[in-house]
UniProtKB/Swiss-Prot annotation:
One of its GO terms (molecular function) is rRNA binding. The lineage of its organism: Eukaryota, Viridiplantae, Streptophyta, Embryophyta, Tracheophyta. This is Large ribosomal subunit protein uL5c. Residues 41-50 have a biased composition (Low complexity). Residues 51-60 have a biased composition (Pro residues). Belongs to the universal ribosomal protein uL5 family. InterPro entries: Ribosomal_uL5 (IPR002132), Ribosomal_uL5_bac-type (IPR020930), Ribosomal_uL5_C (IPR031309), Ribosomal_uL5_CS (IPR020929), Ribosomal_uL5_dom_sf (IPR022803), Ribosomal_uL5_N (IPR031310). One of its GO terms (biological process) is translation.
Amino acid sequence: MAATAVTLPSSPAPFPVTTTASSSRNVRLLLRSPPPRRALRVAASAAADAPPKPAPPPTSPSGIVLVDPTEAQKVHRLKAVYDQKVVPLITEEFGYTNVHQVPKVEKIVVNCGLGAEAGNSKGLESAMKDLAMITGQWPVKTKAKKSVASFKIREGNTIGIAVTLRGRVMFNFLDRLINLGLPRTMDFLGVNPNSFDGHGNFTIGLRDQGVFPEIPYEVGGKKNGMDVCIVTTAKTDNEALRLLTLLGMPFAEHIKSSVVIRKKRLKRHHFMSKGRGRR
């Protein structure tokens, strides 16, 4: 017995109709029962309670996605950690009486020496684009202050690029450096806690910029390094060390930190009397 599905245009029900053809005279219509009203009510209420789909981000006529202005007003995650957790802990630990005494990260200076590529316009432009993608800010060219014959450098020649980060861009770069850049470094065991300069400033050297996800990996390509100098308002290295530790800087545990006390180098004019040489 063969069963065929037939759609009846005159049928008021929108449900499919099945007919069993036993003979040309006897035709029996088998109608599927409609779903109960309770199921329809539950489906309608679920659709009403579902959260609305987020609207697509606005785009300009050229196709560029426009960012909501309120996004720029939000506090960065690392900045919120500093305000809510770091400031109370350091204030209690060092006994500060004023909020302005609490050390903070003032700026970050990223420097990249180019060497022989500084004289190549394509290499210089490529290095500037890479550093701009990493830091989020376009760098400037650094030029030699004096001529050095052994390095074939003349005064005024471009020898590298540098960028100074402050504010939200600074916290964004520091967050990615701590959580993405340093952990992806090969054979990384932590940064040296003795890399302070005695005035609360910390310097990190990276041999490869490819540890940042913004730089694509190229087999056989030249690897450019970079120097990262974190400038803080701390008066001593212990305060700066504690500040960066609370921010998440992975210091090496097998290296003992020591307070660096550097004396000012006395030059020849320091030993000369003030009245000497005057007539």
